[in-house]
């Protein structure tokens, strides 16, 4: 599901709320979450999961076109850990 599909689906479920208001709310929520992570803070949504930053250590990578070795710096990357409730709902084959 893309962001625009999410907005469309939410707007359809909330017919009393204009689609533009739903779009603005979704965009603002995602922007706020990204800003919170950029400040190094963790986000926890009970029953859904948590977002945090994980550190990736420096390493030697390869340029896919040339095969040359490339030194990659350490960096922080976003990480999502699903909550138990979400894991249980997503486990449709278990």
UniProtKB/Swiss-Prot annotation:
Heterodimer of an alpha and a beta chain. GO terms for molecular function: DNA binding; structural constituent of chromatin. GO terms for biological process: DNA recombination; regulation of DNA-templated transcription; regulation of translation. Belongs to the bacterial histone-like protein family. It comes from the Bacteria. This is Integration host factor subunit beta. The keyword Transcription regulation applies. Keywords: DNA recombination, DNA-binding, Transcription, Transcription regulation, Translation regulation. Gene3D superfamilies: IHF-like DNA-binding proteins. This protein is one of the two subunits of integration host factor, a specific DNA-binding protein that functions in genetic recombination as well as in transcriptional and translational control. InterPro entries: Hist_DNA-bd, Histone-like_DNA-bd_CS, IHF-like_DNA-bd_dom_sf, IHF_beta. GO terms for cellular component: chromosome; cytosol. NCBIfam families: hip (TIGR00988), PRK00199.1 (NF001222). SUPFAM superfamilies: IHF-like DNA-binding proteins. The keyword DNA-binding applies. Signal peptide: none annotated.
